[in-house]
A protein has these predicted regions:
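Secretory targeting and sorting signals
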Residues: 2-29, 657-668
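Intrinsically disordered, low-complexity Pro/Gly/Ser/Thr-rich segments with frequent PxxP/GP/PP motifs
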Residues: 94-134, 590-616
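Membrane-proximal extracellular "stem/stalk" segments
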Residues: 513-516, 523-648
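Catalytic grooves of carbohydrate-active enzymes
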Residues: 221-225, 229, 309, 313-321, ...
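Asparagine-centered strand-capping/turn motif at beta-strand->loop junctions
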Residues: 59-67, 567-572
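Short glycine/proline/serine/threonine-rich loop/turn segments at secondary-structure transition edges
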Residues: 131-143, 615-622
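Short aromatic-acidic-glycine turn motif
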Residues: 76-100, 153, 584-594, 629-632
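Active-site beta->alpha N-cap acidic-glycine motif
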Residues: 157-160, 164-274
Length: 689
């Protein structure tokens, strides 16, 4: 840029920042802390042009405890536009007076009258093009509304007591089209409490019902072109809404009517339909704290496996597919984290521009970052109107997209290699309101300089590389104690599922338990998160302890071979398949494992184990339960001794000989008795004669 032109731009910017005002009024309002909010609800035209009349409508709400009288709304706009993004950012950083000149011509402002505490009034201002007094140069004009009023002391300041700002582009035809798109995040706003139920069931139901935040956001998103939208889905939201419908994890005493369940079902069906329309990006279940996982590599693998299982199970249940994506917190990105998240290289990571200090809009919103493990895509979020006064609305979103696109296409005129675009991601907590249709968001994608583009199509194109540094993370991740408790859930759950033949439902439920305590949300209440994780770990261990094994206190064999009983008890609610393995204190003796057997829920089974001591006299055995994959699980039985009597054979021989002697004696005695009887019968009788 030439020096004279630079001086002109600086002078114009200074003029904007100076803000022309009406002289002769006090510099500051008597009320030092006016508390009013302003929302722009409609703005036409969406693109400025000669001959058009700028019409802006919206609402102003008084949050003060006193009334404001003689309230008026004025349109404000500067004489010259911004032509680069850096000009916009500099102006915003320098304060909120950058909007421009207040239009005070008769008939261009709105008299609202008095505004009582907590009262909301609508405003409408109309200013013909000629009365805007603008230069007509191409660029982006900040345009807004300023609210003036008289306080309870009767004093009226020339300073606005409230304001709202958006942007209005003026771009002629013939410019290059740039990619324009919106990312719509749908996150689970609720969490499970200490007892396993959702802590705010009524709040979740309100969000997904008609007029609720998530319902309004979905309706707005569904109204946009498939080519210009990308759904960012948290599977925990799908599961949570489905739980509402089925009455699962609902606190005792909370009863949902059939109509309420129908509202939740409609939301779930509509969200799935929207996500399937253009393909979606899918977060890990409950948006996990990936920084905490990366900082604890010894725990990362089992925890990540559980999160993946919970995610996959939800996607399978709801027949949804999408590209895996990670979303760290705003200031929770490091180069090592990106390395760990790289995976196969096709899973994007969402980061803010603050995480990439050397990033510039000319690189585009989707860039390639090279890690030691290979390249990966990053989606960089950078909101044009961050920090401007006023509440977010559909109109400000529309104007943000149009203005980003206008600045991008103007940049390409002087920088043909620029990849600047107009991709934006809305705040997942934003409520566009039930009157979202009045904002006409679709107009953002009808401009001659915008090209509706999905993020999936962006990833199929060559990406520019970001070779700069990654900022240091300042966010505090979840504690190691919380991760260790989650790892104990994994360990106990893995052991339990290994003995359940049909364990998919059990595995999925345990995976959800793990994922539910690893979300970024727990950073705000780490103590509660850790306590819940420990409780879930204890419950998983308690369930495993319901499967027990009992052995006799001691066993004495009459020979080197014999058997002894082992009893397995299953007090869980699931049928199990489990075997038995033995540890012997005598290294020369090995007891064969008992093959797995099926035991029904609430049943017990006693089996006989055969043993051959061979030449050994005794051994101490410890019985362990064994899963079908050969791993020992649960607590072993108490150790017991098995002995073999060395005189066993002698005893049997002696007993045999004794029996023979007894038998011989009986035979001999019987024979003698028979002979005496025979002799007596053969002797002649004595003759008396």
């Amino acid at each position: 840029v030439s020096s004279p032109r630079r001086r002109v731009l600086v002078a114009l910017l200074a003029t904007i920042l100076a803000t022309l005002t009406v002289p002769g009024l006090p510099a500051h309002a008597a009320d030092k802390n006016p508390q009013l909010s302003v929302s722009i609800q409609s703005l036409s035209p969406s693109r400025l042009g000669p001959g058009s009349t700028v019409t802006m409508t919206g609402t102003v709400t008084n949050h003060n405890g006193h009334a404001w009288t003689n309230v008026q709304a004025y349109l404000v706009i500067p004489a010259v536009p911004f032509t680069t993004r850096s000009q916009v950012e500099d102006a915003i950083d320098n304060g909120d007076a950058y909007t421009g000149v207040r239009v005070v011509d008769a008939g261009t402002f709105d008299d609202l009258g008095d505004l009582a505490p907590k009262q909301t009034r609508r405003f409408s201002v109309k200013v013909p093009y000629d009365q805007l007094h603008i230069s007509g140069a191409e660029g982006v004009y900040p345009v807004g509304v300023q609210i003036l009023g008289t306080d309870t002391g009767g004093e009226r300041s020339n300073d606005a007591i409230a304001r709202a700002t958006t942007f209005l582009p003026l771009v002629s035809g013939g410019h290059q089209r740039v990619a324009a798109s919106v990312v719509w995040p749908f996150l689970m706003p609720n969490r499970r409490g200490y007892n396993g139920d959702y802590v705010d069931t009524t709040g979740l139901l309100r969000d997904v019902s008609a007029g609720g935040q998530l319902r309004n956001l979905l309706d707005l998103a569904s109204s946009t072109s498939d080519k210009a939208s990308t759904a960012l889905i948290d599977p925990a939201l799908l599961v949570g809404v489905d739980d509402l419908i089925r009455g699962h994890r609902v606190p005792e005493g909370v009863k949902l009517t059939p109509e309420q369940k129908a509202e939740a079902q409609r939301f779930l069906d509509d969200l799935l339909a929207f996500a399937r329309r253009q393909g979606s990006w899918v977060l890990g279940f409950d948006r996990p704290d990936v920084l905490a996982l990366s900082n604890n590599p010894d725990l990362e693998t089992p925890l990540k496996t559980a999160i993946d299982r919970a995610t996959d199970a939800a996607l399978t249940k709801f027949q949804l597919y999408g590209r895996e994506v990670s979303w760290p917190s705003m200031h929770g990105v490091t180069s090592s984290l990106l390395r760990d998240l790289r995976g196969s290289g096709d899973s994007p990571v969402i980061v803010t521009s603050d995480a990439l200090p050397s990033w510039d809009r000319r690189l585009g919103s989707v860039v390639q970052y090279v890690t030691p493990n290979g390249p990966m895509p990053l989606l960089v979020t950078d909101v044009l109107d961050a920090g401007v006064p006023g509440q977010d609305s559909v109109v400000t979103l529309r104007q943000r997209i149009l203005s980003e696109a206008a600045l991008a296409t103007l940049q390409r005129e002087i920088d043909p290699k620029s990849r600047a675009d107009a991709i934006t991601m809305v705040d997942p907590r934003w409520n566009p309101g039930p009157q979202w249709a009045a904002g006409r968001l679709s107009a953002a994608f009808e401009a001659p300089f915008t090209s509706p583009t999905s993020l999936e199509s962006m990833l199929t194109r060559p990406l520019t590389s970001y070779s700069g540094k990654v900022a240091a993370a300042t966010d505090r991740p979840l504690s190691r104690a919380q991760l260790k408790a989650a790892a104990r859930i994994v360990a106990s759950g893995s052991a339990l599922s290994s003995v359940i033949p049909q364990s998919d439902e059990v595995d999925d439920a345990l995976a959800q338990d793990v994922a539910s305590v690893l979300g970024i949300r727990w950073r705000e209440s780490p103590g509660t998160g850790t306590a819940i994780a420990k409780k879930l770990a204890g419950e998983a261990g308690a369930e495993l302890r319901k499967i027990t094994i009992k052995a006799p206190s001691s066993v004495t064999l009459s020979s080197s071979k014999g058997g002894f009983p082992i009893t397995i008890r299953n007090d869980t609610g699931e049928a199990i398949r489990v075997g038995v393995t033995f540890d012997s204190s005598n290294p020369a003796l090995t007891v064969p494992d008992v093959k797995p057997i099926d035991i029904g829920a609430g049943e017990r089974h006693t089996l006989t184990v055969d043993i051959d001591l061979g030449r050994q006299n005794a051994t101490s055995l410890t019985a362990h339960l064994k899963s079908t994959d050969g791993k020992t699980i649960g607590q072993p039985a108490d150790p017991f001794n098995v002995r073999s009597s060395k005189i066993g054979v002698v005893l049997w021989v002696a007993m045999g000989l004794a029996a023979l002697l007894v038998l011989a004696a009986l035979v001999r005695r019987f024979s003698r008795r028979r002979r005496r009887t025979r002799v007596a019968s053969e002797r002649p009788a004595d003759d008396d004669d």
